[in-house]
Swiss-Prot record:
Functional summary from the UniProt entry: Plays a regulatory role in abscisic acid (ABA) signaling and tolerance to abiotic stress during germination. May be involved in the regulation of the ABI transcriptional factors.
The keyword Transferase is assigned to this record: no
Induction: Up-regulated upon salt, osmotic, glucose or exogenous abscisic acid treatment.
Pfam families (UniProt xref): C2_GRDP, GRDP-like, GRDP_C
Taxonomic source organism: Arabidopsis thaliana
Record GO cellular component, one term: plasma membrane
Recorded phenotype for the gene knockout or disruption: Increased sensitivity to salt and osmotic stress in germination and cotyledon development. Abscisic acid hypersensitivity.
Name of the gene this protein is made from: GRDP1
GO BP annotations listed: abscisic acid-activated signaling pathway; cellular response to osmotic stress; regulation of abscisic acid-activated signaling pathway
Organism lineage: Eukaryota, Viridiplantae, Streptophyta, Embryophyta, Tracheophyta
Protein's name according to its UniProt entry: Glycine-rich domain-containing protein 1
UniProt keyword terms in alphabetical order: Abscisic acid signaling pathway, Stress response
Length: 819
């Protein structure tokens, strides 16, 4: 108890640290700015970046120093051009260098007080007028069509006041950061409030180290790093706050990017984790704040202007209520079992904890095992996604000694539960909890001793909408591949009808393609997609016009694109939005290194292009092999279902139903992509990083999983010299990787460059239901708890590991065991 009070005192002391910036409001603006820059990726590299750096040195900084304290600007604020603000942003994120450059050239630190961001929608007329007077030959907004690199180089070399800091490299280091903090939960008030509090705790550790003359490289998680960056964007406040706290300006070292085991980032994160937990008695790793893996490869390097093609989205749509599909919310959970007390003699060192949910859902419906930190001396963490309902149930299991036959069941010493709803509804009260839970003894357990208690640490992300997953089930009893759900209800159409069912096996709608050969009133070569709802209503959902499919009374259309390479889209869905369909898994669905057994050619990714997302945003994924679609947004549900049904039906018939392209054509176009992917997988199998898997649906149950596996469990990889493994299985299940020594963890960190996602050495991944073996490895291990159901995260067991990346794109999670 005294130790717990000491932890509380330390935390309260940390919260007394004074920050002269409203970090919550500033972080929201920071995220908005990063989002805007990401929509203008010409700022990341190339001639436009070189021109932006010149304009920053030659125009913006002189304007700022000339007018920032001038009375002529007192009536309004300066608004920098976007390109100049981005370079200024990256310069300030090296606070020591920025301060020294400002002092050298201007005699003082140039602050952002009196400056408004270009993305806030503020009037720029005053600043534009000042700019034109100072720089009549240089337009206020960067002219992308008039960039002369030779001229820029010549003018830059002639500047008297120009930083020698390598701003090109600084931009390249900062560019990936937005991906790490771009998930929707990051922008919520409660997540940012806790991030601010954790940032103060982070600074408190640094202060302690300086007072004790300890040289430690502290590495932040991404929630802390976001707030740290935000603080640095206010140069004078950051300088004053840091000098007051530690006597100097705290350096932000973002130059280290080597995430290998034993390197600076790896050891720094391990030591930061240990110091945090020793000082505050709470967990450092946090749901939704861990490394997501590398930024996905873009589907295009040129922004797509789609506004000309977009139809009016406000037009009345009588198809909106044709199908009923309840929205489901999802949270990411990070779980760790810290300790056990009052454990009876004879059980020490033999116990573990099985955890599950009282209300299993489509995202998490299995029982998983975790070791206890105090018993084994190694950190093991589970991250997974689930619906924010019911309770987490924990059972303390005592394993049998090795001399007792394996057939004997492990002894259940008791159970306890923790309500998810208590913390998330009706108002989110907190996103982290760590407490002792007293166990209720199981039947037959001794009751004459003190009650056993477990110390459980759980963190959550705020609930967000879960993607909708729908499956195409053929009504033919002999169907193979896509019929992994029982037929629900009676077939209202012909025997070749396709039932669309959700994850609960509830029928949503029944579809059938009807053509002129069926008789009736259809013209020659005309085809229709007919739909029958659960209420019995029959509607024409799509009509083939001879060159494209017209969907939902011409509100949408599905067209084939003449793709010259496998990297280009094959189809497009046009309507109130513009969606292009690419072969393979792209962007958020990009396959990771434990997903090799499912061919990337089995999938098609739906990518929306808009003014807000000129480089594309994933909105859905179609599994062509098993016939399913995941839709991230409601507007895509009906046009997405109809389009996926047409593509799945047409491509299997060799293109005879309206498209020339076939599955064979797609595979031929993608041979080079497949060859490159195979080469990368061979290389990555022997590297030190494992990243995450993406998939959408499961094959036939029990495929490759071993005993008790429901078919939803995904890959099982047991590696001898492997490290951790992330996962991203669209809310289903991820990889299981058990590794021994020579493993490294994955912190998060400064500028988005630190942290590790670790790869299994000598291991190969796989799709759902696959079992992968590495060197000196076999089978599944015992991490499944007797049944690998959907919704499990990855299991990674490693020695001397640090940090943990919580699932790619927020979809699933990891189980990481680290020293």
């Amino acid at each position: 108890m005294d130790k717990e009070k000491d932890h509380e005192v330390e935390w309260l002391e940390a919260q007394k640290i004074e920050i002269s910036v409203d970090l919550l409001a500033a972080a929201k603006q920071h995220l908005l700015f990063l989002e805007t820059v990401d929509r203008n990726r010409w700022l990341y590299d190339g001639p436009a970046l070189e021109k932006a750096i010149y304009r920053y040195n030659a125009c913006w900084l002189p304007l700022l120093v000339k007018y920032s304290e001038s009375s002529s600007v007192s009536e309004g604020s300066l608004v920098p051009p976007l390109d100049c603000e981005w370079i200024w942003h990256c310069h300030r994120l090296n606070p020591v260098r920025y301060n020294s450059d400002c002092e050298q050239f201007y005699g003082r630190v140039l602050d952002n007080s009196g400056v408004l961001s270009s993305v806030d929608g503020n009037c720029k007329l005053k600043t534009e007028d000042l700019w034109k007077r100072l720089y009549p030959d240089e337009p206020y907004e960067l002219d992308l069509d008039n960039i002369d690199l030779e001229d820029i180089s010549e003018k830059s070399s002639a500047l008297e006041k120009c930083t020698k800091y390598d701003l090109v490299s600084a931009v390249k280091r900062q560019s990936p950061f937005y991906y790490q903090v771009s998930r929707s939960h990051v922008n919520s008030d409660i997540f940012l409030q806790e991030a601010v509090a954790r940032y103060k705790g982070f600074l408190y550790l640094i202060k302690m180290n300086r007072e004790r003359s300890l040289k430690r490289f502290c590495v932040p998680t991404y929630d802390v790093d976001l707030i740290w960056h935000t603080h640095q964007l206010h140069p004078v406040s950051y300088c004053d706050d840091m000098v007051k706290l530690i006597g100097k300006v705290l350096e932000h070292d973002d130059t280290d990017s080597d995430r290998g085991k034993g390197k600076k980032l790896d050891t720094g994160f391990s030591k930061t984790t240990a110091q945090w937990e020793e000082t505050f008695g709470t967990r450092y790793w946090k749901a939704g704040a861990m490394h997501r893996g590398k930024t996905p490869v873009p589907v295009t390097n040129s922004p797509y202007a789609s506004d000309v093609l977009v139809k009016d989205p406000t037009a009345k749509d009588d198809f909106q209520n044709l199908i009923q599909f309840p929205e489901v919310e999802v949270v990411e959970v990070l779980l760790e079992i810290i300790g056990v007390r009052n454990l009876p003699d004879g059980h020490k060192g033999k116990v573990s904890v099985m955890f599950s949910k009282t209300q299993p859902d489509s995202l998490f419906n299995a029982e998983r095992r975790l070791t206890i930190l105090s018993e084994v001396g190694e950190k093991q963490v589970a991250t997974f996604q689930c619906e924010p309902t019911g309770e987490l149930v924990f059972k303390l299991i005592s394993c049998s000694p090795s001399k007792i036959p394996v057939s004997r069941e492990p002894k259940n010493l008791g159970f306890a539960s923790l309500s998810l709803k208590e913390f998330l509804f009706p108002v989110i009260t907190q996103l982290s909890v760590e407490k002792w839970l007293e166990l209720t003894p199981s039947k037959g357990s001794q009751t004459d001793t003190k009650p056993i208690s477990l110390r459980v640490a759980v963190s959550f992300t705020p609930p967000v909408r879960s993607p909708s997953v729908l499956h195409m089930v053929q009504s033919r009893p002999s169907c193979k591949g896509s019929c992994f759900f029982p037929i629900i209800g009676k077939s209202r159409l012909a025997k070749s009808s396709t039932h669309i069912v959700d994850e609960t096996q509830t029928e949503v709608i029944t579809l059938q393609i009807r053509n002129s050969a069926d008789g009736g009133i259809l013209k020659d070569d005309q085809r229709q997609v007919m739909g029958v709802t659960d209420s019995g209503e029959t509607r024409v959902l799509a009509v083939y016009t001879g060159s494209f499919w017209s969907l939902l009374d011409s509100k949408w259309s599905l067209k084939q694109i003449n793709a010259s390479t496998a990297d280009n889209p094959l189809f497009e869905i046009l309507g109130p939005r513009v969606v292009k369909i690419f072969s393979g898994r792209k962007l958020d669905y990009e396959p990771k290194h434990c997903a090799n057994l499912r061919s990337d050619l089995d999938f098609m990714t739906l990518v929306e292009f808009s003014k807000q997302h000129p480089y594309g945003k994933t909105v859905g994924l179609v599994d062509m092999r098993f016939g399913s679609i995941e839709a991230k947004e409601n507007w895509l549900l009906l046009p997405g279902i109809v389009s996926a049904f047409i593509l799945h039906t047409v491509l299997k018939k060799g293109g005879s139903e309206g498209f020339n392209v076939t599955t064979k054509d797609i595979k031929e176009e993608s041979k080079q992509t497949k060859l490159v992917a195979a080469t990368e997988n061979n290389v990555n199998a022997n590297s030190t990083n494992v990243e995450t898997q993406t998939a959408i649906t499961a094959p036939k149950k029990g495929s490759g999983c071993g005993g008790g596996c429901s078919g939803e469990c995904g890959n099982m990889v047991k590696a001898a010299n492997a490290s951790g493994c992330g996962s991203s299985c669209s809310g289903e299940c991820g990889d299981m990787v058990k590794s021994a020594a020579n493993a490294s963890g994955c912190g998060s960190g400064c500028s988005g460059e630190c942290g590790n996602m670790v790869k299994a050495a000598n291991a190969s991944g796989g799709g759902y239901g696959a079992r992968c073996k590495a060197a000196k490895a076999s089978g599944c291990g015992g991490g499944c708890g007797g049944g690998c159901g959907g919704g499990c995260g990855d299991m990674v067991k490693s020695v001397n590991a640090s940090g943990c990346g919580g699932g790619c794109n927020g979809e699933c999670g990891n189980m990481v065991k680290a020293a």
